[in-house]
A protein has these predicted regions:
Chain A
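An acidic, low-aromatic, low-complexity terminal/linker signal
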Residues: 1-153
Length: 153, 677
């Protein structure tokens, strides 16, 4: 048996993703977002989280998935990594589960179109479902954003 | 005992003491006869020594100890200050300072102090005179006096003077308990107490010996004080582990008895010489006793806690605005009253919270006199620095940033502004140049001015250099006003000094100043008159955390523009916009100024001013450049709390930050400087 990991499970385009609980500050319902001009399309803008201004990213956009309108189930997961605090818009956030760190396998080369470097690994939830563990540092990597911006221009 | 807990306190206090040592030595240099200043210096050095010894910084303690020895001779009139002693003391302070900085950086505070200690020792023994070839005859002859309970002539005269002016003189014998463990510490507490209530003239054994526990069970002191005997006695005896305090009131008769065993007076002119410093000391003593009660009590607070307080308060401010809106909608008089009262209280609270972060500019200014002194010496110029308005307060964040730009400007004034001494005399000016450093409030701004009475700025030379360095073309130069030419000094890669010195004139510096001040939301200006002098003025916002702003609308989006850069608002018609060489301009108050489309710049999704026949514009200013910014609608003026956009979004163009509006929404703050090219 490896270490027990507490993981927040959220859904994005019919897939299940996981982030370690200690990286997550809060989970919020959708709230008004103020657009910030001249930023990549997946950066939705900034929100007021109890007096602190926090940027919000649409994770669908970040992973190059089709962006959809927010629904009743949409949530903003506020994560903190290094000295960055960022909100992720996800389709829904439903669960907190314990998984065994041994149960996380290294990701296969191609997983649902999302490049492997954003992923820490894949864990089996039950017979049907797989849980994709996010690599937060890579998701929040700004160097790549700069490249993206250059691509857009 | 965990010393780490005391380390930050030690560092803070050491810095304070070093600063006060520096200041007072400078004061003493201009008035070397004033023994009251020596007393103050001595006390600072003494406290510093005690503190460093307690914390285990041996080198610090031993260096301050030697300084103390020198100062002790000076304050007892056994040694006269001269240039060599000043230089050695200043050097010692520099070494002390670097040791303390080492401790701040996590070091051990160790340094090789043997050289400087040797010089100090030479001063004490009087040997240095042969090296320094000073003319004054040695006056250290009294060193060999036997030490006993008897007072020397100087101390006697001090005591006599005090009696004449109505003070009481006590002889106190303090006995510590037999089982006392920390004799030195208890004795120190007694000394603390005595020095608070009066002045200790003489102690037996000496203070140093008492601190090293070189006494048996009792020690005695002579004390000058206002306080009644009984009160003092109980206070001393209340110090733990003190057995008794035996006090005797001295009168002139007993005093003359005491002076009997002391040596005959060395020279007939001694008493006359002694009287004056004694009187000075008296003055100091009484003023010290009076101000002692009036000193305001302060505590040191971690700046981070103040930031948290500020954040919490700004949340409250946002809720207040929201409540006011709701109360306006609900229209119930008791609710409105409560909300109004809350608004008043929160207004007062805002003042206090902002004031907490305000620091007098003194904390930046106080290192300049020393810097100017050294600089003037290096350049062989005579310069007086006159500081006014050091009590003017600025936000802590601004204070932290303003130091370097000011150093640059001051160095520039002394290196390039103030002329060499011969040149000044030729021009009929006083030999020593004057640099005025002024700080004052005006409206929501603080101004800092640096004025020198030097040679002023030579327009032609500045222009020639600028043209040579390709900053402007000769044609451009002709049409420039004097002030525009002076501002070229702030252009990157500019230097007019013919001789490059290590003080300034590397061509970097002044442009750094302007960049820094601009980033603080301030502005720099120059006035100059050839042959008369130059004034550099810096305009700074009072605070960086709450600013007044104009809220505007672009379609559904709201933005804030800082009021400090708005000149006025106006409405223009479509046909007033001229297209000149591919850019849009309007005529405004007789000048042609560019017009900026905010909606295009910010890629506004639902507003386009080209659909309108009449457009609201905000006229903004950056230095002497103006521009008109087209907006959809004015909302109004409001105090807003600045919030950073966060690390993830830094460097968004034309946006300098965000704020939270009364309805809880985030509004972006436009950076007007980015709108004017």
């Amino acid at each position: 048996m490896g270490e027990e990991l507490k993981v927040i499970v959220f859904a994005l385009a019919n897939e299940h993703y996981g982030i370690e609980v200690d990286k997550v500050r809060t989970i919020e319902r959708m709230m008004p977002i103020t657009r910030v001009p001249k930023t990549p399309a997946f950066i939705k803008g900034v929100i007021n989280l109890r007096g602190v201004v926090i940027p919000v990213i649409d994770l669908r956009g970040r992973f190059g998935l089709e962006q959809t309108e927010a629904t009743e189930n949409s949530r903003i997961i506020i994560v903190a990594s290094n000295d960055l605090e960022v909100g992720f818009i996800v389709d829904s956030a439903n669960d907190v589960i314990d998984i065994d760190s041994d149960a996380i396998d290294t990701p296969p080369e191609v997983v649902g179109g999302i490049r492997a470097k954003y992923l820490r690994g894949v864990a089996k939830l039950d017979e049907q479902r797989l849980l994709i563990m996010l690599n937060l540092v890579e998701v929040l990597n700004k160097d790549e954003i700069i490249q993206l911006e250059q691509l857009e221009e | 005992m965990d010393m780490n807990a005391y380390l930050s306190m030690f560092i803070d206090e050491s810095n304070d003491h070093l600063q006060s040592l520096n200041e007072n030595l400078l004061r003493l240099e201009s008035a070397p006869e004033d023994l009251s200043i020596v007393q103050v210096i001595f006390r600072s050095a003494h406290t510093l020594k005690g503190m460093s010894a307690t914390m285990g910084f041996e080198d610090l303690a031993s260096l301050t100890h030697e300084m103390e020895n020198v100062l002790d001779l000076v304050r007892n009139n056994k040694l006269k200050m001269d240039g060599f002693i000043f230089d050695t003391l200043f050097k010692s302070l520099d070494v002390l300072d670097s040791m303390v900085q080492d401790i701040v950086g996590g070091g051990t505070g160790k340094a090789d102090v043997s050289n400087i200690v040797a010089s100090l020792k030479a001063i004490v023994s009087g040997e240095y005179r042969t090296d320094a070839a000073a003319g004054a005859p040695a006056k250290t002859g009294m060193d060999g006096e036997p030490r006993g309970i008897e007072l020397d002539q100087f101390q006697i005269s001090v005591l006599q003077q005090s009696m004449e002016t109505g003070h009481q003189v006590f002889h106190i014998i303090v006995k510590v308990r037999e089982d006392c463990v920390l004799k030195a510490a208890r004795a120190y507490m007694v000394f603390e107490l005595l020095e608070r209530s009066g002045e200790v003239v003489k102690s037996e054994p000496s203070v140093q010996e008492i601190e090293q526990e070189k006494f048996d069970r009792s020690f005695s002191v002579y004390l000058i004080t206002h306080k009644p005997m009984e009160e003092l006695k109980t206070q001393i005896e209340n110090v733990s582990e003190i057995e008794s305090a035996q006090m005797t009131l001295l009168d002139e008769e007993s005093l003359s008895l005491l002076s009997q065993p002391s040596k005959p007076q060395p020279a007939a002119d001694r008493p006359a010489e002694d009287k004056r410093p004694a009187a000075d000391e008296n003055k100091l003593r009484t003023s010290g006793a009076q101000s002692g009660g009036a000193v305001t009590k302060t505590i040191r607070v971690d700046i981070e806690r103040l930031d948290v307080l500020m954040n919490l308060f700004s949340e409250l401010l946002i809720d207040r605005v929201r409540l006011e809106q709701l109360a306006g909608e609900i229209r119930r008089s008791d609710l409105t009253e409560t909300v109004e009262h809350m608004a008043r209280v929160s207004g007062d609270l805002q003042n206090i919270v902002l004031k907490l972060r305000m620091v007098p500019v003194e904390s930046v200014f106080n290192r300049f006199p020393r810097m100017i002194r050294d600089l003037a010496k290096t350049l062989d110029k005579k310069v007086d620095l006159v500081i006014t308005g050091a009590e003017t307060e600025l936000d802590r964040t601004v204070i932290d940033e303003i130091g370097d730009p000011l150093v640059h400007l001051l160095r520039n004034s002394i290196d390039h502004g103030i002329e060499a001494t011969e040149k000044r005399l030729q021009a009929g000016k006083p030999e020593s140049g004057t640099v005025n450093l002024r700080a004052f409030h005006s409206g929501n701004n603080v101004f800092i001015e640096i004025e020198d009475d030097g040679g002023g700025i030579n327009r032609e030379r500045v222009l020639a250099t600028a043209i040579k360095n390709g900053v402007v073309t000769a044609d451009q130069g002709k049409s420039m006003s004097d002030e525009e030419v002076y501002m070229l000094l702030f252009a990157p890669g500019f230097s007019t000094a013919e001789k490059i010195s290590d003080i300034s004139g590397r061509g970097v510096g002044l442009d750094v100043v302007q960049t820094k001040i601009n980033s603080l939301g301030g502005a720099v200006g120059i006035q100059s008159e050839l042959g008369k002098g130059t004034v550099f003025s810096i305009q700074l916002p009072l605070t960086l955390s709450i600013i007044s702003a104009m809220l505007i609308k672009l379609g559904s989006e709201k933005f804030a523009i800082p009021l400090s850069s708005i000149m006025e608002t106006s409405i223009i018609r479509r046909e007033q916009i001229h297209h000149i060489h591919g850019s849009q301009m309007i005529e405004f108050r007789g000048a042609i100024i560019p017009i900026v489309s905010l909606s295009r710049l910010l890629a506004s999704p639902d507003f386009d001013e080209s659909q309108e026949t009449e457009t609201e514009v905000v006229i903004i200013r950056k230095g002497d450049k103006w521009a008109a910014v087209m907006v959809d609608e004015f909302i109004g003026q409001s105090d807003i709390v600045l919030k950073p956009l966060g690390n993830y979004l830094n460097g968004s163009p034309a946006v300098s930050g965000a704020t939270i509006l009364g309805d809880g929404q985030v509004a972006l703050i436009i950076d007007p400087n980015a709108l004017i090219k």
